Amino acid sequence: MNTPKPSILIIDDDESIRKVLTEILTGEGYNVESAATGKEATEKAEAKLFNIALIDIKLPDTTGVNLLTKIKETKPKMRKIIITGYPSLQNAVEALNKGADAYIMKPLNMDKILATVKEQLQKQIEEQEMTEKQLIQYIETRAKQIELHKENKP
């Protein structure tokens, strides 16, 4: 059975960064789409399921943190990685508090990006497996409760 390739949405107003990231991530076997604005990113995220969004902190029509909040509301399982050229502890803390799963500094180190993407995909898989285990456990518990209820009825 073929496992679908993970999908990544790159959100950055710098066309050269979008192109380089698209080329490298596609070469690693990922399905990649990109957006230059928050509006375009929101439309793409609503139309398709992405495993990961790489979000620039500064976009022409919004901030990465605002976009992060918006995406988190509609796509809570999508992993969100903030990319910034503004090395500030305040930016990092704010992004993480608003739901970023990771934070990468520019200039971009491709090894760091690939490692972070793989790490976030693994966490996504682990969360999905945990959710499935919890669901199975709930169903088994409910089945036992129903069975006990039937046995105790006259």
Residue ranges with predicted function:
Residues 123-154:
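CheY-like receiver
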Residues 108-117:
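C-terminal output helix
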Residues 43, 65-77:
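Short amphipathic alpha-helix used as the core "switch/output" element in two-component signaling
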Residues 37, 63-66:
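Acidic catalytic/metal-coordinating carboxylates
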Residues 15-33, 120:
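Two-component/phosphorelay signaling modules centered on CheY-like receiver
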Residues 18, 60, 84:
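The feature encodes the CheY-like receiver
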Residues 56:
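Active-site residues of response regulator receiver
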